[in-house]
Amino acid sequence: MLSFLTEVTGAIAQTSARRPIQFMVVPALLASIAYLSIIDDYIPEHIKSSSGSSGISYYHPYTSSHYKSQPDLDKWTAIDKEHINDDIYTQANQISVIPLRFRRFQDVVPNVPNAIHISDNEQILIVPTDQIENSLDQLQEITNNGITWKARNNDKLAKYYDYIRYGLNKVQDAIQHAENFDILLIFVAYLGMWYALIKVFVDMRKIGSKFWLAFSTLTSSTFAFLLALLVSNKFLHTKVSLLSLSEGIPFLVSVIGFKHKVSIATIVANSSTASPEDVPHVVGKAVSSHCLSMLRDHLVVIGGLLSCAIYAHHLTGLRNFCILSSLILSFDLILVYTFFSAILGLKVEINRARRTEDLQNALEEEGISSLVAARVAEQSATIEHPNEHNFFKSNNSSIAYFKVIMSLGFFAFHAFWLGSSWLYSTTDGGESFSRFSFLSNIPTLSQDISQQIPIGRKGTVVTILPTIFFMPSGFMVQLEDFIYLVLSKFSSAIRDSIISKFLVFGFALSIVTNVYFLNAARYQVSATHKLIEKEISRPQDSSVTATTTTTATGTTSSGAATSKTIGNNKGLKSVQEIPDNEDESSDEELEIKAPVKVLPLEECVKVLKEGKVKTLSNDEVSSLVVGGKLPLYALEKQLADNKRAVIVRRKAIAKLANAPVLDTNRLPYAHYDYDRVFGACCENVIGYMPLPVGVAGPLIIDEKPYHIPMATTEGCLVASTMRGCKAINAGGGVETVLTRDGMTRGPCVRFPTLKRAGAAKLWIDSEQGQATIKKAFNSTSRFARLQHIQTALAGTSLFIRFRTTTGDAMGMNMISKGVEYSLKYMVEECGWDDMEIVSVSGNYCTDKKPAAINWIEGRGKSIVAAARIPADVVTKVLKSDVDALVELNISKNLVGSAMAGSVGGFNAHAANLVTAVYLACGQDPAQNVESSNCITLMEKDKETGDLNVSVSMPSIEVGTIGGGTILEPQGAMLDLLGVRGPHPTNPGANAQQLAKIVASAVLAAELSLCSALAAGHLVQSHMQHNRSKAPAAGATTTTTPAITDSKASNGSIASNGKDLKRLEEGSVTCIKS
């Protein structure tokens, strides 16, 4: 049963995520209908009656005892509108009362002639009804002491000032009449509610959503509240008063909270980029994983509330609220599976689309052409999420702005026409209206008003008109009038019978169109995949197969169809295609199949001038290149086919360099994506150079296993690293620490005098200079952020070292652009117009060269990796011992490197691993110069006897976007490590992790090689020790073992054949390494 519920809820959530628009629009429409249906139930009657009314009329009969005296308030009776034209009322004395109220923004309010003062800012004007129109015209504008007061409509923004003040008064009155314990209880409940609401936004920020996920979470609960209120009021007839709602909802929110929704959103956000599954499955799994816990929590609370409703059925207010709360929880549960799941599905789509766009922007900032960057980003998204049917092809900040503006516009529009406040009670009269009350546009008849009205002989009918509000004329009044005018016109247009129908029709058409396009996009992707599968499984046509022909020289050639690599759900497969022309075929086959006469060079030149080079054959284009009419670098542009350009270039260079080897396949060129190479990685391409790629591992790095790819032609390197991985894993794996992250660029500038150069240095080193340049630098990139500027002065030349974070890119192009702009900004805006820029790179970086500044200050990622190797593992796996390793490391890596004057070379062979991993993962192999800076340290644990080994590498320069990482094989190796592309939530984390992997691989290789060297030395010493014991006449006995442990010193090694064999194996490994 439980598994059935989990499957059902997961299926519902998947359906919602697959059809997000339907499952978002329908609940929103239902919630809107519910809102419109119940809003009238909570509008106070006195406000209802005053809305749009022309006034309220009262009648007082004639009594001789009250003639020309104070009337009796109890004898005033309200007149129904149906009877206002009865004779008794038409013959009575007709008087109109105009209430006036002045908003106190000034010390003195104007005195209206013939008006009676009620309070400091309240007056009433009593006039005969037949003079009312003239009086109202005179009241439109009043001038007093140079200040113009304008009559205002209270249905504008100013009414909310009254609502807030009245609400505060009501709260204050309620507090004064409540028990202290009740006040404390309600206060704690409200604190809990606001804590839960704020926590939603805080938790959603942690998973990368600043506003919309939290807002959607609250919207889902709000919809549940409205739907529950509709069912409770209209169907169950258990209306809950506003007082009960205001006191009970905080308790409900505090008890239930939003933890399940936040947890589901967290799982979806984490899986949106890490999981290759499509969006509906990601959302469905997240929801089904919380099905049982969410059902349990909600059902327990619902059961408790219903029990309370049954037990306390005589307490109507409590019973109704318990029923409403149960309905809220039920609808909330349903909306989690529908509305909220649909929102999560859209959010995942947007995140994946945004990540693709961010990758494209980062590649463009790295200097890669926009076309290549767009293709790489799109293909990367396809590879990461092969099952994804993504219909978000672009994402722009304007979309977010549009959503914010629409949301604010909705609330603003509603605020102007809300016309009520839920803070009011639903009863008329009482103490609140004992005086002249302006919270309703039409106040009730009060004692203050009745005392000013004389009673006629036939009675008196007094009509109290809506209150006229006055405000001093100013900018805010004019702005309010403008906003009110615009919204009123818009509202009038919406209310129009014809326009409203068109709007409804357009809304329905928009929904249908969106659904149609989303389904069409999904169908197109599905149809494409089916077509690919069909092409793969179709039998090969005989006309496409290779044909073997024999030429006059007896050589054999085969014309084969090209193989194009296509990515699909199951990986990369090869699909045979029929060549459109003879470009892919050999010359010999062309002669036999379609002997075509090659145009002379002059004719080819004419075609070149006409811009129709692509119509020529490969041989004809090649003749243009050989004849010097077409540059080698222009082939891609002229032919508009990168692969064909490679073929033609090979033909041309084979003739120019007299290198027939390029006419063969010894240097391969086929089956390669040259679109990623052109404009990004290489120029004048003639093929690609295959390198064998091995894998070392798994190596546990920070409690996570990694298989490390290594491209190398050096034998035993991968095997040696594997042995180091095994030993490290036996001790628990590698621990890594990132101590610094910042790429550098060090331009050189020059000044006319030393004084100016020194002043510039001091200014750059100051806080003002650092802040100014940082602001200019950061404006050039979305990713690069300047950390620090270091300067050095040599004569009149000033060297400036910029250190910058560059996200997941290695960042050289990104930082160079920022440096250029910063220097230009210094010249043009900061008063250093006499500064001359010698070079953007002044070797103060330092890039691709040995330099102590990189060793000391660091460059790129500074990583320290350490591991503990148990003593028995050193013996059994590494075939050595701890003391020998420690002694060897001191003598070789520390003392030996120091004697050689090395800078950053205190290691055995760090460059081996750095270069191998760099080649496999698309890094710049030239940067192994500074990236291989490493010091290897080993020491023996005094308590356990284990080996503690570490490598410190202060200048590892890597990136996971840009450069060679855009090539598919190298990108695949980054995928193997799980660090391809930009990190979805923490920019720079992927590149940092790659640097940690590089350092950990170096640690494994260092450990293995040093163990082999130490074992070889031990064998040599041991053999010498054995020979010294053998009797040899006339021979000089020498017993000087270079490295011995406690066993060797007492001769026990000689008697232990196993140790001898172990050391011999270690020496063999040493020789191979």
From Swiss-Prot:
Positions with biased composition (Acidic residues): 579-589
NCBIfam families named among the record's database cross-references: HMG_CoA_R_NADP (TIGR00533)
Protein name (database record): 3-hydroxy-3-methylglutaryl-coenzyme A reductase 1
Recorded metabolic or biological pathway in which this protein acts: Metabolic intermediate biosynthesis; (R)-mevalonate biosynthesis; (R)-mevalonate from acetyl-CoA: step 3/3
Leader sequence residues: none
Major localization listed first in the record, in broad terms: endoplasmic reticulum
Polar residues bias: start-end ranges: 1046-1055
Tagged with keyword Electron transport: no
Catalytic activity: (R)-mevalonate + 2 NADP(+) + CoA = (3S)-3-hydroxy-3-methylglutaryl-CoA + 2 NADPH + 2 H(+)
Keywords of the record: Endoplasmic reticulum, Lipid biosynthesis, Lipid metabolism, Membrane, NADP, Oxidoreductase, Steroid biosynthesis, Transmembrane, Transmembrane helix
Gene transcribed to yield this protein: HMG1
Residues at the active site: 714 (charge relay system), 848 (charge relay system), 924 (charge relay system), 1022 (proton donor)
Subcellular location: Endoplasmic reticulum membrane
GO biological process, one term: coenzyme A metabolic process
Entry GO terms, CC: endoplasmic reticulum membrane; peroxisomal membrane; plasma membrane
Protein's job: HMG-CoA reductase; part of the first module of ergosterol biosynthesis pathway that includes the early steps of the pathway, conserved across all eukaryotes, and which results in the formation of mevalonate from acetyl-coenzyme A (acetyl-CoA). HMG1 catalyzes the reduction of hydroxymethylglutaryl-CoA (HMG-CoA) to mevalonate. The first module starts with the action of the cytosolic acetyl-CoA acetyltransferase ERG10 that catalyzes the formation of acetoacetyl-CoA. The hydroxymethylglutaryl-CoA synthase ERG13 then condenses acetyl-CoA with acetoacetyl-CoA to form HMG-CoA.
Positions bound to CoA: 720-726, 877-879, 1021-1022
Residue span(s) of domain SSD: 182-346
Region ranges (Disordered): 542-589, 1025-1056
